[in-house]
Amino acid sequence: MSYLLVAIVCLLTSLGQLCQKQAAECWRRLPVAQRQRVTFGWLMLAALLLGIGLLLWLLVLQHLPLGVAYPLLSINFVLVTLLAHYGFGERVDRHHWWGIALIVIGIYLMQGE
């Protein structure tokens, strides 16, 4: 159950980051008249997702040692990279993909007790 909560926390915080990116993009490209309203909506959604993620993280910390739980959050780097690449069309070079692979391997190795 604790690992499921960690996965949910990672998903919520990654989506929160993407909402912040969307807010920044809206601020940059929308006319001034629409900018505040649309950006505010994305920022509120980001705050909601990150806030729920924080509350669930507190539950995780009640059940897993910090030294086990915290490294699992590095999956956020993987999720944000994938979502940014496929959702925003951001370019991810070969070195970045190698870094992502090493993060996944590191998470696997740390959990192999």
Curated annotation (Swiss-Prot):
Membrane topology of this protein: Multi-pass membrane protein
Subcellular location field: Cell inner membrane
An annotated Gene Ontology molecular function: carbohydrate derivative transmembrane transporter activity
Entry GO CC: plasma membrane
Pathway(s): Bacterial outer membrane biogenesis; lipopolysaccharide biosynthesis
Transmembrane segments: 40-60, 64-84, 92-112
Pfam families assigned to the protein according to its UniProt record, in alphabetical order: EamA (PF00892)
SUPFAM superfamilies linked to this entry: Multidrug resistance efflux transporter EmrE (SSF103481)
UniProt KW Lipid metabolism keyword: yes
Assigned keywords, A-Z: Cell inner membrane, Cell membrane, Lipid A biosynthesis, Lipid biosynthesis, Lipid metabolism, Lipopolysaccharide biosynthesis, Membrane, Transmembrane, Transmembrane helix, Transport
GO BP terms, alphabetized: lipid A biosynthetic process; lipopolysaccharide biosynthetic process
Function according to Swiss-Prot or TrEMBL: Translocates 4-amino-4-deoxy-L-arabinose-phosphoundecaprenol (alpha-L-Ara4N-phosphoundecaprenol) from the cytoplasmic to the periplasmic side of the inner membrane.
Family: Belongs to the ArnE family.
PANTHER family the record matches: 4-AMINO-4-DEOXY-L-ARABINOSE-PHOSPHOUNDECAPRENOL FLIPPASE SUBUNIT ARNE-RELATED, SMR FAMILY PROTON-DEPENDENT DRUG EFFLUX TRANSPORTER SUGE
Summary of subunit composition and partner proteins: Heterodimer of ArnE and ArnF.
Name of protein: Probable 4-amino-4-deoxy-L-arabinose-phosphoundecaprenol flippase subunit ArnE
